[in-house]
Amino acid sequence: MADKFEFTAKEREETIALIDHLRSTIGATLQPKDEEKLRVRLANSLTYNQVHRDVFGLNPILSGLQTAKIVVEEIGLKRDAVLAILLHPSVEDGFMTIEEVRSEFGESPARILHGLLRISELYKKNPVVESENFRNLLLSFAEDMRVILIMIADRVRLMRQIKDNTNDEARHEVSQEAAYLYAPLAHKLGLYKLKSELEDLSLK
């Protein structure tokens, strides 16, 4: 059995700060029971040991909150994107269905999550992603442009976090994708600041 997932003291502090920040930033767009339902879902995922660190040792709940902060502050998305980001690990790992998301949070977050799952399937079928053909496939599979915006934000978040990580092989792979896939997508969508940051971080 896998070790029980635990937050470090620093992660707990940052998580609380990010939740407070997101609440103050997008609170007006949240529906009455959004936060309560999300808290229950995340608490259950911890209780049933459904949360695991990624290949870089990063905390997925904290990573989701960091990505959510980027999509809110640097791209301008709000409630539906944030909910989709925070629920994505549970849905991707099979602990929650798209139908449950639709029932609890509405059609819009469910639509974004459906697009994110389609992209995951596309990745599994295409080991080589550094091509214009794959970028075009990505755009068509996403269905909703918010999916691509979230993916760009998540890659920016990951690149910021792993610049000093010792897993050189995984870091190199992520950097290659940032330079050849996500930076061109960011440019195409007019996210020039994020595009430049992706290019800069991919060289480090």
Which residues are covered by each model-predicted region?
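Active-site helical microenvironments for divalent-metal-assisted chemistry
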Residues: M1-K204
